[in-house]
């Protein structure tokens, strides 16, 4: 590298998301202009695709996690109340990927209306190393789609 040339955001080809570029820019300012070395953690960044329905993801996929260690998968699909009331066929999918050994939630995946909103909050829990039991101890907000994240009690499959 050249000492006087810096790069952040998409040009680095690390994680091509606007909030990552903003975080990298702020870290650059802190490091270079405030003499406060500030690394950016590029692990476990939640992301969403704003299609219809939305898709949100954070952490490892089922396939990636299974290559690393034995896992449990908690998955559900259901018709959300808003679709039922409107007579629409829309369905929701939610999945938690859990380490069998440590019980840490390794990944969370949502396909649903407002999945981007839900995955942002799930991302905090996953980033903090929450366990499946931490999710289970959380009281659900009812009636919501996201309550399924804390009410899935039986693994769908183990690998």
Task: Give, region by region, the residue ranges found by the protein language model.
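Rossmann-like dinucleotide/flavin-binding elements
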Residues: 1-44, 102-103, 144-145
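Flexible, glycine-rich terminal cap/loop adjacent to redox cofactors
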Residues: 33, 50-61, 66-159
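Helix-loop-beta segment of a Rossmann-like dinucleotide-binding subdomain
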Residues: 45-49
């Amino acid at each position: 590298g050249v000492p006087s040339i810096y790069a952040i955001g998409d040009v680095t080809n690390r994680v091509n998301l606007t909030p990552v570029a903003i975080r990298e820019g702020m870290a650059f300012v802190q490091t270079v202009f405030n003499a406060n070395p500030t690394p950016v953690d590029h692990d476990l960044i939640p992301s969403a695709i704003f299609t219809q329905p939305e898709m949100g993801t954070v952490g490892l996929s089922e396939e990636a996690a299974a290559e690393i260690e034995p896992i449990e998968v908690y998955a559900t699909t259901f018709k959300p109340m808003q679709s039922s009331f409107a007579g629409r066929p829309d369905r929701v999918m939610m999945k938690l990927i859990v380490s069998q050994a440590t019980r840490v939630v390794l990944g969370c995946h949502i396909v649903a209306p407002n999945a981007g909103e839900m995955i942002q909050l799930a991302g905090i829990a996953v980033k903090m190393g929450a366990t499946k039991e931490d999710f289970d101890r959380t009281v659900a907000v009812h009636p919501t789609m996201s309550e399924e994240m804390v009410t899935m009690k039986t693994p769908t499959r183990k690998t």
